[in-house]
Amino acid sequence: MEFIVSCINRGSRFAYCVNLGERITIKKVDITCSPGEVIEIDDYSKPVPEGSRRKFSDKALRLPAIETPIKIGITDADEITKRMWPKIEAAAMLIARKVLLSIPVIIRFHNDADGSSGAVALHRALRAMLESKMSTERLNIRWIMNKGVSYGTSEAAADKLWISNYDCIEKPLMIFIDFGTSVDSNQGVAYMGDSTEIVWLDHHPIEDGFCGKGLEHYINPWLFGGDSSYTAGLLSCILSKAISNLDTSIMEDASLIGDHSRYARFSDDGVAISTILDMITSDPEIVKTSNQITPAEIERILESKKRREELLHYARIRSEEAMAAASKSLRKHQLPGAKAFISDFKKVRKDGTKYPLPGRFASMLFDRLSASEQEPCILMLHFGSYISIRMDARLNAKVGMRSLIAEEKRRHEEVISSGGGHDLALSIKLKDESDKEMIIRDILMLVTERLGKGKDANDQNT
């Protein structure tokens, strides 16, 4: 039998070999091999005979065939996919290569329905690819649910420490799904340096100065004539199809629904799975004791019809309780031709619960408000040092909320830590939560000015 020694775990002295479904324990069998060698052995539990090694040749590796084009039946989205296809194809080939070579891979995905649906699709694709090679899932693929919206130095330091355990035939691989397109990620990327290769799948608007834009495998629909409605989860599903040609339609639906995409297809399964993903990524303790959750664990939950029904019932109860509490505590501002609503999340969610998360509840509440109001709406929901903003597209066309937040950051550099997001869904992080009422008033003033009226809105309780 012939195996490529792809990497060696320094701490525990495991050798990971291509086409071998198990690890060779170096301490047990006195194997003195190094990454990049091809070894020929009849029994991997015995020492490697002399003269059985040779250098790895690139030609020995067969990558999965990738056929084009991949379509989902949504004309605009399919056109964007077509424009992104060379980048998607290259990223899929790179991911397949690293996994088949057993190179260490870290996959970070955002903790919401969009990020987790993309992670589940990729998990299924990699599992199918490995099974087609009659191999087990590699133990050196690490899945991390990323709670923040950026990739900071603390995350990078943890990743670099894990990667440092390995001597590899090639550079390890980092994959980011649905987060990180921010200048706040620059330090994390710089910290990693050239120690890894990176595949970055995102759909957030690209901030000026964001260094990830220049990476070879950074893929974002904004660079190809698209926008945030082409979600990161959808992008990950398309890439996953390229790897293993699986049906990812339900995860596509869950992603599009979860991120309020205009491409959303409201299938029953899509709505149910989007709700479940949203809940268990908001509060992993609902399904386990750890604050982390992996795609494999998500799949075990989704496979149980009884568990799915229990979680959906719980989600409906918690959402309605939160909605009722929010309705009682809303403040309303009358703007010129529009309405603004302010919600204090402390008055919404019960103590000790994590679902719904503030940002996701802001979207739920805004949908309810905009459906009941004839005038365009803006909602600002505040929680701790954060302000989550949702806005009607008609209002945004007049106001330009992303540029308004950029102006607000320039005006209050000493107060605002960070801010940004999509056109209609943004957030601001403050250095001190005591400043949030001042920032909310200032945003209302700027919105009013941009609507062509130079007066502050009149605050009143609903």
Question: Which ranges hold each PLM region?
Answer:
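Structural detector for short beta-strands of small beta-barrel domains
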Residues: M1-G11, V38-I41
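Beta-strand/loop nucleic-acid-binding surfaces
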Residues: V18-C33
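An N-terminal, well-structured beta->alpha segment
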Residues: P35, R53-R108, G115-S116, R124, ...
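A structured phosphate/pyrophosphate-recognition subdomain
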Residues: L100-I107, N111-A113, D208-G352, S363-S372, ...
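N-terminal small/polar loop signature for handling phosphorylated ligands or for N-terminal nucleophile
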Residues: N111-D114, A125-L201, I206-F210
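Flexible glycine/proline-rich, aromatic-decorated loop/lid segments
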Residues: V199-W200, H204-I219, S403-E414
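Glycine-rich, acidic loop segments that terminate in or are immediately followed by a histidine
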Residues: F341-T462
